[in-house]
Amino acid sequence: MKKTIALVTGGFTGESVISLKSAEVIERNIDSEKFEVYKIIITPESWYYIDRNAIKHTIDKNDFSLNIQDKVIRFDGVFIGLHGSPGEDGKLQGYFDMVGLPYTSCDALTSAITMNKGYTKAIVEGIKDLHTARSIQLFANTPSAAEEVLAGLNLPLFVKPNNGGSSIGMSKVKTAEELPLALEKAFKEDDQVLVEEYIAGREFTIGVYKGKEGIKVLPSTEIVSSKEFFDYEAKYTAGITDEITPGRMTGEEQARVERVVTEAFRRLNCRGVVRIDYILEEETGKFFFIEVNTVPGQTEASLIPQQVRETGRTITDFYTELLETALGK
């Protein structure tokens, strides 16, 4: 008997555009013989499903159900395809825990923590062979903020909204004069900003997931961008970035990376599939942790689908494993 699945998408931030594109890919690739899928769009104004006749049906938030032509649709589980808030910061996960619905992503606590880049770095600190860039976390754009940063860190710097995604509001700062504008840009996206020293090296991203056989690591992807860094345009515009899967690493580097990201996944108590970004430092080859994305993109241009295909599996088979693991099958 088919399981009834809610595919949630949309969101409250600028990443909602990417969420909708991810949902299109997910919806096309979920096994229709095993799952009946309803795409639920979540916006600040409404949670709803649009049927084939373009009629909008509002979700009953009391139990996350639908009423279509006097038939109540209740879900067996949720595939979370919503980037940013409320799908990636723990809010939806907490709600689904309260109404008793299983879902494909990390739980509420892990989602909330990993959305905060500074807090995540503090938790993974101490994992063998994992390094983090020196950083300062700012909680307000005070007149002395730039001065505080320059006194504590060495240029060049990366300035990031602490709770953001898709590199929105992020800047690379090479001179002291560029810093105030970069801080202003980041604080427009978030009320916390993380400033990190730049690490010169090769940039990679790698998928890690928990399936029927425990924690598994996907092939890495090496990011070679023609831009200064892997920003929003580089991530979602064809031709700007070369994405090499599997990434070019020695056998020792690959084994070390797999061990480090598996331990980070375990320490952060992750579930479902996450994407961990890292740099192998130019001169030393050391692993520098950047961040973890608990609802990684699933668009045609996204990296997790590339990595899954590299293993010889179909994305349909992969989504089936994620759903069945979440449902406890």
Residue ranges and their predicted role:
Residues 5-9, 21, 72, 113-202, ...:
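Active-site nucleotide/adenylate-binding loops and adjacent lid/helix of ATP-dependent enzymes
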Residues 44, 142, 163-165, 199-202, ...:
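Glycine-rich beta-alpha junction loops
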Residues 138, 170-175, 208-211, 281, ...:
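Short beta-strand-to-turn element immediately C-terminal to the catalytic PLP-Schiff-base lysine
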Residues 174-259, 286-288:
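Phosphate-binding site of ATP-dependent enzymes
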Residues 197, 265-298, 308:
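Conserved metal-phosphate-binding beta-hairpin within the catalytic cores
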Residues 222-274, 303-329:
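Active-site "cap" helix and flanking loop/linker of ATP-utilizing ligase/carboxylase catalytic domains
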